[in-house]
Swiss-Prot record:
Species this chain originates from: Shouchella clausii (strain KSM-K16)
Main enzyme class: oxidoreductase
Biological processes annotated in GO: mannitol catabolic process
Binding site for NAD(+): 3-14
Family: Belongs to the mannitol dehydrogenase family.
GO MF terms, alphabetically ordered: mannitol-1-phosphate 5-dehydrogenase activity
Protein name: Mannitol-1-phosphate 5-dehydrogenase
Amino acid sequence: MKAVHFGAGNIGRGFIGALLVDAGYEVTFVDVNEKIIDALNERNEYKVTVAGERKETETVTNVRGINSKTNEKEAIDAIAEADIVTTAVGPTVLPYIAKTIAQGLKQRTASKPVNMIACENAIRATSQLKKDVLSHLSEEETTALLKDAGFADAAVDRIVPNVQSDDILHVTVEPFFEWVVEKPALKGDAVQLGKAVLVEDLAPYIERKLFTVNTGHAVAAYVGYRKGKKTIKEALADDYIKHRVRGALNETKAMLVEEYQFDAEAHEDYIDKILLRFQNPHLEDLVERVGRGPIRKLGPADRLVKPAKYLAEKGLHPESLAETIFDALHFYAEGDPESEELRALVDEKGYVDAFCEISKLEKDHPLVEIVAKE
């Protein structure tokens, strides 16, 4: 079985790529990072350290790489032969790889199933990828393609920090992982996804993860940044920051329990588990890494604004989320284009107007009024 995975970064190698190899696939990583691609082709393997109570290092084999910047034709050919195509490139990059995927799918001659799964921290990223891919195809090509091509949304969860290593391919991950895939959208009777969990309805899993794991991580990062903390572990050692994270997750819990009828007690246990993961003593996750991309993370459907908006519109006061939104408007990470853009926007318009533009909310929206008081 053959898999093509876009994104040979830490998440691609340490999470999705490793799971695909474990499920029996030969994995071709597609990326523009020349050094990583060259190293993959030189060795055809890499090491993953699982940082639990005992550090265990595994070797992931049966891998290779393609530089899509210099060898796009080779990437297209690989897609034409693949059984599965996955991504971990960041949601904003999906439109840029869609044309290559479309060309590879058009080139397929065998009438066998192929499935696309975008493994991104965004709601229904595969659905977005599908739109982007189909925009490069004619109506006839689309009809023919969709007979054999599945586009399955997924929820992904694993902390993969940037850990310094002399080995460019070595990656460190936490023991916990969750890859949940929407089963009805898959094509083929026996899709091999190994340790992935296949579910009939993905929506609850996407939102539970986004509004617990990603929200909690964001709160720790943005509050930690303003408090001068360097790592998430250091941030959560501060009782004030831990209180802020717990407060925000209690607010998102209220939304999730009402929207999806999650058991409140079970969800509280889930929050406890997430907080323990964030405090893993064997992981050094940088505040700057977690906070990067603040404009996307302040978007109307993302981890902070969506739950805060939901609660504010019900007449509730999402204090912890609103405080974090205000903290996020101060965030800056060197080398992060969105940080540069955010700083320029705030300098030009001020915090409240900048927030309105990013969140697509009117100035008289109850959430904006709460944030303005911060």
